[in-house]
Design a protein with these regions (language model features):
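N-terminal charged segments
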Residues: 1-64, 75-76
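A short helix-loop-beta-strand connector motif used in the catalytic cores of GNAT acetyltransferases and
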Residues: 15-17, 65-66, 91-94, 149-159, ...
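A conserved beta-turn-beta hairpin within the catalytic core of GNAT-like acetyltransferases
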Residues: 35-41, 91, 174-182, 191
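Conserved acetyl-CoA-binding loop-helix of GNAT-fold acetyltransferases
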Residues: 50-57, 186-188, 192-205, 209, ...
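Conserved GNAT acetyl-CoA-binding A-motif
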Residues: 63-73, 207-219
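A conserved beta-strand-loop-helix scaffold within acyl/acetyltransferase catalytic domains
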Residues: 138-189
Length: 249
């Protein structure tokens, strides 16, 4: 799961206007360089070195860049101690969930229209949703997740609309026959209306049609019940530390 997450966040943020990445054994840093913690991530797993971890944390702190440190279970509690010593705050236990290959059909609110994003208008619509769902500045979202992302063979972004208005968005990253699910969001004023279920089940059904056989995601508390309903099961729980403010907790 650690390696899949590394590959996925690199794909997810790779089209950001100010994208920057660095890697060491057991460590992957992927930065949009936007002032939004949820768009800058350091992933920590087995084999990571304490000194390299500290150096990567300091490289972000020295620039006053908000970011998340996502520590997988294979990394010892010593990494948590280093994060705390450097002033990061513990945000949450963050479960990663997997859904293996079982049949799936679109469900949820049938009045929601789902499209696979392809044009600038769709990028703007997705940004509107993420701005509402996660309190992110829209200009930061558009720079971090631009329309050029749609041209990547490793990514699809799906947008949900009702009456022409954007109400949901989700990003899928592809890794062989495995798919990562990221930036799943519903407009804050339209939650609990079956939009998220319709959006995600439709996107996943299309991915299965295209040959995907396994899905994984990191589950926020707000989305956990939806993911369980769709057959996801927790396979490990990471520890998330933050410098700045996160809306993943």
């Amino acid at each position: 799961m650690h390696r899949l997450t590394n590959a996925a966040i690199t794909t997810f943020l790779g089209e950001a206007a100010r994208y920057e990445a660095a890697a060491r054994p057991g460590l992957q840093l992927a930065l949009s360089n936007e002032a939004v913690a949820d768009l800058n991530m350091l992933v920590v797993g087995a084999g990571a070195d304490h000194g390299h971890f500290r150096a990567m944390l300091n490289s972000c702190l020295d620039r006053r860049l908000p970011f998340l440190a996502v520590i997988f279970p294979a990394a010892s509690k010593a990494f948590d101690d280093i994060a705390a010593d450097l002033g990061l705050a513990y945000a949450a236990d963050f479960p990663f969930m997997v859904r293996d290959d079982v049949p799936l059909e679109p469900s949820g609110n049938p009045d929601v229209e789902i499209v696979c994003a392809s044009i600038d208008e769709d990028a703007d619509a997705s940004a509107d949703v993420l701005t509402s769902a996660y309190s992110m500045p829209k200009d930061s979202v558009l720079r971090a997740l631009p329309a050029s992302l749609f041209d990547s063979t490793g990514v699809d972004v799906y947008v949900a609309r009702t009456n022409g208005q954007p109400v949901g968005s989700v990003t899928l990253t592809y890794h062989g026959d495995t798919c990562g699910i990221w930036a799943m969001g519903t407009d804050a004023s339209r939650q609990r209306c079956g939009i998220g279920l319709r959006l995600l089940s439709t996107a996943m059904a299309q991915a299965r049609h295209n040959g995907i056989r396994r899905f994984f995601l990191g589950a926020t508390p707000a989305g956990y019940r939806l993911y369980e309903k769709l057959g996801f099961e927790t396979v490990c729980t990471t520890r998330v530390w933050v410098s700045g403010e996160t809306h993943q907790a």
